Design a protein with these regions (language model features):
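A ligand-binding cleft/hinge motif common to bilobed small-molecule-binding domains
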Residues: 60, 76-85, 131-134, 158-190
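Ligand-binding clefts/hinges and TM-proximal coupling segments of bilobed small-molecule sensing domains
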Residues: 3, 127-147, 180-185, 214-242
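Short helix-initiation/N-cap motifs at beta->coil->alpha
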Residues: 53-64, 107-108, 143-155, 192
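Short loop->beta-strand "edge-of-pocket" segments that line small-molecule binding or catalytic clefts
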Residues: 10-16, 33, 111-129, 139-142
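Periplasmic-binding protein-like
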Residues: 17, 94-104, 169, 173-214, ...
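Flexible hinge/capping segments at coil-to-helix
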Residues: 92, 101-120
Length: 242
């Protein structure tokens, strides 16, 4: 199994460094904590190899590291276009996506956002932007080239450049806590399946990872990791998904 999952002798795992649902990087020590760190640590222990965790700026970077053979596994939310480039495991967690709006916004629930004349923002390449482009029928979806900083996003919402912004609930809860003039809607517009990804075409490797995830979910490892990280709107994936 070690030769299949970690051919260099070290398990190399890439994750989205800007997504707190996957993990956080300590600014002083640079150590990674959160579900990604806990899952990689346990997988490496079972395989019997050391590991490294590689921060990546976005989904394209994670896929690029896999294709360049500089990472053995990656962590991404499932979507069909990405599945044409990499193979996805069964999900280990479900990440809820919601909107953040101005505190005085008339938008009270997710369905209110899909109205003519409203501008809904999301970041390019994120699972939320893919979902919103495919599913909003009346509102204008504005795709930003990168995830804006909290300060930039607050300015866009307060100035009226955007009426709402879609992202994972954990990210939005953190943003609203720091900016009282913003609020997160109480409901969610979608749930993204957080999975492990590998290069395409190796069914035996994928089977090993799927068995590991099934065990990690059934044993409570994933739930414990989510609880320890104090993540909002994230749950261990139930059995039988994909």
């Amino acid at each position: 199994m070690a030769a299949d999952l970690a051919p260099t002798g070290t398990l190399r795992a890439a994750f989205l460094s800007t997504n707190p649902v996957q993990g956080r990087i300590d600014p002083q020590t640079k150590s990674v904590t959160g579900p990604v760190a806990d899952l990689v640590r346990e997988l490496a222990r079972r395989v019997g190899v050391p590991y490294i965790i590689i921060p990546a700026a976005d989904a394209r970077a994670v896929i690029g590291l896999l294709k360049a053979n500089t990472a053995d596994v990656g962590f991404l939310a499932f979507d069909a276009p990405r599945a044409a480039e990499v193979d996805f495991s069964r999900p280990y967690a479900l990440m809820q996506n919601s909107y953040i709006v101005r505190a005085d916004s008339p938008i009270r629930k997710s369905a209110d956002a899909d109205q003519a004349g409203l501008r809904i923002g999301a970041a390019q390449g994120q699972s939320q932007s893919i979902y919103l482009k495919d599913n909003l029928k009346s509102a204008q979806v504005k795709i930003l080239s990168a995830m804006p900083s909290p300060e930039e996003l607050q300015k866009m919402l307060v100035a009226g450049d955007l009426d709402a912004f879609g992202a994972n609930r954990q990210r939005l809860v953190e943003l609203a806590a720091a900016h009282p003039n913003l609020r997160v809607l109480p409901d969610n517009f979608s749930a993204a399946e957080q999975s492990i990804v590998i290069t395409k075409g190796d069914r035996s490797r994928l089977d090993v990872i799927n068995r590991f995830i099934e065990d990690a979910c059934a044993s409570g490892l994933v739930k414990t990791s989510i609880d320890r990280a104090k993540l909002s709107g994230v749950d261990a994936a139930p059995a039988g998904i994909r």
